[in-house]
Amino acid sequence: MEARLSTGEKTKKMATTSRPSSPLPPEEETAAETTTSEEEEQQQMERFYALVANVRALRAMFKEAALPSCREDDVSGGGGGEQRQKRPRAAPWRPAFEMAVFECGGGGGTTTDDIEAATTKGQDGNCKKGKRSEANAAAEEDKGEVIEGKPVAIAIVADGPGKSTTMPDSN
């Protein structure tokens, strides 16, 4: 805080920057104005740099005072000037594909014929040995039981006069 000026220094600088009491010729007056404006600008620059130096000194002082004790006790993490430690980024999820999933089915979903063939041969439709698929397990549990399907809602759509088409509802 050494950059602050005492009141005595301020009055001295004001006295030096004030205009002389005797009138000057126009050429000398403009020259005197430019020198006073340059002096004022120089003083403003000096005050600005002194202010910046004071701010830096205060920041350093508070940073040194807060190092050992406050940072350990500071749970909220605010105001200490320290940065939060960043967590390491987790690797993005990558799907794991197995070729057996794509090779065996030949496309589409499983039909009842496929399930029956898999249960009679003892093979699973997913080609994984030692594991039973849900479809294969369900087919083994049924063993010829008749299961009724869910009721399906049908919507009738008219395509024009005298034409209608039935479409099953996708519920």
From Swiss-Prot:
Cysteines paired by S-S bonds: none
UniProt cross-references to InterPro entries, sorted A to Z: NPR1/NH1-interacting
Subcellular location: Nucleus
Signal peptide range: none
Region (Disordered): 1-45, 65-94, 119-143
Compositionally biased region (Basic and acidic residues): 1-12
Record key words, sorted: Nucleus, Plant defense
Source species, domain of life: Eukaryota
Bias-annotated ranges (Acidic residues): 26-43
Function in brief: Binds to and weakly represses NPR1/NH1-mediated transcriptional activation of LG2 in vitro.
Name of this protein: NRR repressor homolog 2
Classification lineage: Eukaryota, Viridiplantae, Streptophyta, Embryophyta, Tracheophyta
